[in-house]
Amino acid sequence: METSQGWLVACVLAVTLVWTVAEDVCRAPNGKDGVAGIPGRPGRPGLKGERGEPGAAGIRTGIRGLKGDMGESGPPGKPGNVGFPGPTGPLGNSGPQGLKGVKGNPGNIRDQPRPAFSAIRQNPPTYGNVVVFDKVLTNQENPYQNRTGHFICAVPGFYYFTFQVISKWDLCLSIVSSSRGQPRNSLGFCDTNSKGLFQVLAGGTVLQLQRGDEVWIEKDPAKGRIYQGTEADSIFSGFLIFPSA
């Protein structure tokens, strides 16, 4: 320690001496820089700088984290537009049988239509090939027209028609029916008579008729001679069996 202090004192004296001598002589030109001194001690920490600009995004991202817990349900949204109708589904199974209905009131046969007629030939008019039965015996609800020989249906349903006609000759008759706008239908009956005796030709049928349909008896022009007298009568009858549903 004492050696260092002595060395420092010697240096100070030498510098002073040189300075004094230098004042007495002419100034010499500047010399070259000396050797760099020993680095000084670190200074005190400076003040905190301002915040820098955000850096560019990194090239690689981190590992994807685990799925988080489900959040709370949001409020209901507004109703959407009505969609197009879907395709028709398959036919469902039959449902159980319903309960038995209440028994209805008893029907009154007096309130039901009961068309029926019977007519015989007495003094019939000539009406082509139509066989006219001019004398009416029964004509319930007036379905039979004795001037034309036609039955006109007013109550749709199933009817029975029959005839018994007297003749001494060969005879062919038909029960003819006709619907409005439809071709007529006929059902023929024939009988031969070689002895010239009274003989009955009979026929009958059941027909389903609609309102406005007509039924009559028609003769064959070549075999249509009917007995006309007081000894026997020819008759044409018909009636409703039951109405259509």
From Swiss-Prot:
Native organism taxonomy: Eukaryota, Metazoa, Chordata, Craniata, Vertebrata
Domain of life per record: Eukaryota
Predominant cellular place of this UniProt entry's protein: secreted
Residue numbers of 5-hydroxylysine PTMs: K48, K67, K100
UniProt xrefs under Gene3D superfamilies: 2.60.120.40
Region (Disordered): 35-111
Assembly information from the UniProt record: Core component of the complement C1 complex, a calcium-dependent complex composed of 1 molecule of the C1Q subcomplex, 2 molecules of C1R and 2 molecules of C1S. The C1Q subcomplex is composed 18 subunits: 3 chains of C1QA, C1QB, and C1QC trimerize to form 6 collagen-like triple helices connected to six globular ligand-recognition modules (C1q domain). Interacts with CR1 (via Sushi 24 and Sushi 25 domains). Interacts (via C-terminus) with CD33; this interaction activates CD33 inhibitory motifs.
Keyword terms: Calcium, Collagen, Complement pathway, Disulfide bond, Glycoprotein, Hydroxylation, Immunity, Innate immunity, Metal-binding, Repeat, Secreted, Signal
Signal peptide span: 1-22
Record-level GO BP terms: astrocyte activation; complement activation, classical pathway; complement-mediated synapse pruning; innate immune response; microglial cell activation; neuron remodeling; response to iron ion; synapse organization
Organism: Rattus norvegicus
Function: Core component of the complement C1 complex, a multiprotein complex that initiates the classical pathway of the complement system, a cascade of proteins that leads to phagocytosis and breakdown of pathogens and signaling that strengthens the adaptive immune system.
Protein name: Complement C1q subcomponent subunit A
PANTHER family recorded: COMPLEMENT C1Q SUBCOMPONENT SUBUNIT A (PTHR15427:SF26), EMILIN ELASTIN MICROFIBRIL INTERFACE-LOCATED PROTEIN ELASTIN MICROFIBRIL INTERFACER (PTHR15427)
Regulation: The C1Q subcomplex is inhibited by sulfated molecules, such as triterpenoid sulfates, heparan sulfate, or chondroitin sulfates.
